[in-house]
């Protein structure tokens, strides 16, 4: 219905649709709208018993995708009454329920959504938020620094706690569990939590800074997750962690728990690339960012640009803006198809993690800004002089680059020289620069902007 007048309370969705040969794209869009709301494969007489014209989703616009033959952007509007208030499970059951298996479409991808203020007001939003987190950590004017304990699996609890202590003592703000460390036979969660918090408390006492460790509470049941989260709080942790794979209802439940108990909630996006990486089918990661901000997480991994994981510069910028802006406008180069008022939901902190090191610090600050957590796992644990030296190298690299930026220097162009100058009085930084130099994982991204040529990730 190209004449449909969009209401302020409508939920809007944009699908990238590749119809089967011979299928009209307008008909495909109409079928997507129908199947994701009220319709089935045939006319049913019970339609007469409902306000079907109100509840049926409306496909109101179909545009060809630039430079991509036989693929179309299909815009669909949903009435707000189609969705239960504050329930991601109900929302996603409609939006990504049956339609991705439609025979009439060869491929389908959910690119973006717009949520009305009336619906957002029914969601909690981040449990703590960036502003309160900075106040709690007493860290301002720079990105937060972290690292993931490596190796991911196999360490004993005591050795695990030693890694935590060394990293925090060296200058990091956070250490973290990785996505697949839960409560395995080689180290049960209680052992890991106890030794990790011993390391946190010791490092905090020595440094005079607030420190934290993301304790992964992911488990098989909600009862187990609550038990682990409560144990983390009893030990004095300020932050707990979950994985995306636990599901939307579990994520919202942990978001509510974190708000109730005044804890920061970190989300690892484990599993997202199974459906977000390919450009023609699945869903764009920016949609996951929006859902997770609504669900109540405080942190979410959102890309690095220069690291080892998928990350086009423009797309990453769009993800970060989605998590941090209170209001965003249409920005097609960054993949933002709708203006969005976030109804004062708190900011969700993007996390940059995966294949980054101190030699890239000028690039990271340029691309990602201050409001993020930069996590150097291998770039800390892999330092030749040890974990503490790796942490110190990252902290010195960050602070010298922030200082240069604040002095008005062209820190992007001068970045390598700024690091070399700082390394003259910091042996760990010099060792790190000698080892990793300017290594960058510069592969062509699979998910790139449709409306402009993508910039290179190298500076």
Curated annotation (Swiss-Prot):
GO terms for cellular component: chloroplast. The basic functional RuBisCO is composed of a large chain homodimer in a 'head-to-tail' conformation. In form I RuBisCO this homodimer is arranged in a barrel-like tetramer with the small subunits forming a tetrameric 'cap' on each end of the 'barrel'. Substrate binds at residues 98, 148, 152, 269, 301, 353. It comes from the Eukaryota. Its EC number is 4.1.1.39. Keywords: Calvin cycle, Carbon dioxide fixation, Chloroplast, Lyase, Magnesium, Metal-binding, Monooxygenase, Oxidoreductase, Photorespiration, Photosynthesis, Plastid. Its cofactor is Mg(2+). The modification N6-carboxylysine is found at residue 176. It is found in: Plastid, Chloroplast. GO terms for molecular function: magnesium ion binding; monooxygenase activity; ribulose-bisphosphate carboxylase activity. The keyword Magnesium applies. This is Ribulose bisphosphate carboxylase large chain. Mg(2+) binds at residues 176, 178-179. Belongs to the RuBisCO large chain family. Type I subfamily. It comes from Haptolina hirta (Plankton alga).
